[in-house]
A protein has these predicted regions:
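Hydrophobic/aromatic beta-strand elements that line small-molecule binding cavities or substrate pockets
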Residues: 1, 13-16, 27-33, 145-150, ...
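Glycine-rich beta-strand-turn "strand-cap" elements at beta-sheet edges
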Residues: 1-3, 43-65, 115, 139-154, ...
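A solvent-exposed, acidic/Ser-Thr-rich amphipathic alpha-helical stretch
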Residues: 1-6, 21, 101-153, 170-174
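A short, structured loop/turn motif at beta-sheet edges
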Residues: 1-7, 33-38, 150-157, 184-190
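A mature extracytoplasmic/lumenal domain signature
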Residues: 12-14, 30, 45-46, 108, ...
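Short beta-strand edge/turn micro-motifs at domain boundaries
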Residues: 25-62, 176-197
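Sec-exported extracytoplasmic/periplasmic mature domains
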Residues: 34, 89-97, 109, 113, ...
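Short, low-complexity N-terminal intrinsically disordered segments enriched in polar/charged residues
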Residues: 42, 50-106
Length: 197
């Protein structure tokens, strides 16, 4: 939840049952905006998940230290948006310099979640960095944000962009694919860190 109470995100597990009796396991991540009509999904991602045990225990909520009134100054929100788009680009640039695993370690939060390829979510920047490429001195991909939404309080936001391989894609893989990343910071004076993807 953002400090202004107007942005939030959820993630979890689902079981999809087809009319033919088939069962598919999945994970989801949703970014929400509060509107006069209620909460509405601004971004939604459903990922398949393999069989396996998953913890259904609730994580502590990712909440701001204090509640703030929404800020109606569009120039302030535009400034927050610019810093968030720049943070996403800096994350990719750092991955090119130090490797994708170390960049995920440096740019994430201890309470970050990643959908990944396991049955459950990977929790924490350290574990996520190991899952995506620990020890790798390079990055197989580069990316950047084309757009972003940011709470008026400047502490929660989401970036949207495209990931591209740094070389020819493996046979049968797309040359580029869309992504979104959810970011949090304690205050507008602090650096952005990814919290969910």
């Amino acid at each position: 939840m953002s400090a202004d109470g107007d942005h939030g995100f959820t993630f979890g597990y689902m079981t999809l049952r087809g009319e033919d009796g088939s069962v598919r396991l999945a994970k989801y991540l949703t970014y929400w905006l509060r509107t006069p009509q209620g909460w509405r999904a601004a971004a939604y991602k459903r990922m398949g998940r393999p069989e396996g045990e998953v913890s259904l225990a609730l994580m502590p909520p990712s909440l701001p230290a204090q509640r703030l009134a929404p800020n109606d100054d569009s120039s302030v929100v535009a400034g927050h948006r610019r810093t968030l788009i720049a943070a996403e680009q800096a994350f990719s640039d750092e991955a090119q310099r130090i490797g994708i695993g170390p960049a995920f370690r440096r740019n994430g939060r201890d309470d970050a979640v990643n959908g990944g390829g396991e049955a459950g979510f990977t929790i924490g920047a350290e574990a996520i960095s190991r899952a995506v490429g620990d020890g790798s001195a390079t990055s197989p991909v580069s990316w950047g944000a084309d757009d972003a939404l940011v709470a008026s309080s400047g502490d929660l936001g989401i970036t949207f962009g495209v990931i591209r391989p740094n070389g020819p894609p493996p046979e049968g893989r797309p040359a580029a694919f869309a992504f979104f990343t959810i970011w949090r910071r304690e205050s507008p004076d602090e650096p952005w860190r990814y919290v969910a993807e």
